[in-house]
């Protein structure tokens, strides 16, 4: 005899499970009442439908209606006007049925007794906020019962311009996804599979979608264009809009490259400019001096030498510069950072091109030659000064 040994009787656990199941069914029934606005009672072969106001009155005066009302309604069978998106045969004890009138509105949804469901069933509900929507359809939603292999249909129905009120409880978690596209005539929600604990079969739920679609930024396209990235939450872009101004290179994919030198670039705009360094093309001339440049940014930086504009001030000393590159090099004076050193004399320089120019004093290299007289110079600025003075 164990005496005071601790144990968990199966009957106690079963009572707790039944209590939890009853709470979940009550919550589902409340949600259906919010959807339909009606309460259904069935006696023998006759179905009677009451509005919420009528049901409140009957409940308050139930002593007068004992013969026509039951405390726990039995399961109702689908009427002739019922509409299902999936007509597969499912056991009656695992099914919850929604019926509608001939006008297409909701009329009845009966909670039924079923085996204990998995704890923490998550129901995802989608609401629509777009303008002039005429029809929104929701695909059938199924859940997986813990310890089983067969998906169980929960509800399959059509909504006509109705919004589900937010209903928050401890057992059911609702997440709303809004469809913001203007003048949308048909909004369809694709299912996403979710794995319920203790099962091996993915279960479709509504409201989310996984996709990988390249971003084709175009003002003429009428379709939404999600970016080339893996979407884990449902993301809807407004028509003819682009959230990100540049393409994102997906993981595992190489950036674009040229066919000539094999150099890689992260942006297609950089790829289009790079071949000009091989061909020598400079299609952007300066309106002041006529000097040409390979891109607009270089032209804009050069143009500041004519206007005297220096929009990049140093936060330490207040000195201004015409280029952000010059400002970056200047800041190294304050920080003491010296990245480039000469291998011959050990002298430090703020940038690599200053080091390269200095290194020619050791090698004697003069790569800049005058096309008029053939004289060579080690620095391009010396060549430019020679042309102005001599030629």
Curated annotation (Swiss-Prot):
Biological-process GO terms, alphabetical: regulation of transcription by RNA polymerase II
Bilayer-spanning residue ranges: none
InterPro entries attached to this UniProt entry: Znf_C2H2_sf, Znf_C2H2_type
Protein keywords: DNA-binding, Metal-binding, Nucleus, Repeat, Transcription, Transcription regulation, Zinc, Zinc-finger
Keyword rRNA-binding: no
Family annotation (PROSITE patterns): ZINC_FINGER_C2H2_1, ZINC_FINGER_C2H2_2
Gene Ontology CC terms: nucleus
Superkingdom of origin: Eukaryota
Subcellular location field: Nucleus
Pfam hit, one: zf-C2H2
Major localization listed first in the record, in broad terms: nucleus
One of the record's GO molecular function terms: DNA-binding transcription factor activity, RNA polymerase II-specific
Residue ranges covered by zinc fingers (C2H2-type): 284-306, 312-334, 340-362, 368-391
Record has Transcription regulation as a keyword: yes
Function: May be involved in transcriptional regulation.
Record family assignment: Belongs to the krueppel C2H2-type zinc-finger protein family.
Protein name, UniProt field: Oocyte zinc finger protein XlCOF7.2
Source organism (scientific name): Xenopus laevis (African clawed frog)
